[in-house]
C-alpha cells in the first residue's frame, strides 16, 4: 500500500498499524522513515521513496542506516530517467534500488536497469507490456 497516498490516513505510525492489522497488506511505500521503521517492526515489506531534487537527496540515500533507523527493504528513486545518477546511487545504496517516475518506454527501462536498478516502477501500462 502506498501509505502516503491513502486519503484519510495521517502520516503517523498508527496508520501503519491500521494497514497491517485491518488491510493485511504485505508492505508499504512511503517517503517517511518513521513509517518505514514502524512497518519493519511489524514485519512488513518496505519501500522508502526518494524524490531526487538535489544532491542532498542522494546523500540521504547514502546515509541510510547511519542513524540507527531500520533500513528499508528497497529504496525507490524518482524520477528514474537519470542513468548516471542511478548508477551512483546503486553503487552506494545499502539496499536494492527501484527506478520509478517518468519511465515511458523500453529505452528508459533499459537505461535504468543498465545503471544497476534492481527493478523499474511505472504506472504506464504500455511499459508493462514490453
Residues of each region from the PLM?
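Hydrophobic faces of well-ordered beta-strands that scaffold small-molecule active sites
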Residues: 1, 28-29, 46-50, 73-77, ...
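N-terminal active-site wall of soluble small-molecule enzyme domains
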Residues: 1-25, 33-44, 54-64, 83-86
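Structural motif
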Residues: 22-23, 42, 67-70, 92, ...
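Short loop/helix-cap segments at secondary-structure boundaries that form the rim of catalytic
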Residues: 36-41, 88-92, 111-112, 130
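A signal for specific C-terminal beta-sheet/loop modules enriched in small/flexible residues
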Residues: 44-56, 103, 109
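Strongly charged, low-complexity linkers/loops
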Residues: 60-90
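Glycine-rich phosphate-binding active-site loops on the catalytic face of alpha/beta enzymes
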Residues: 79-85, 101-130
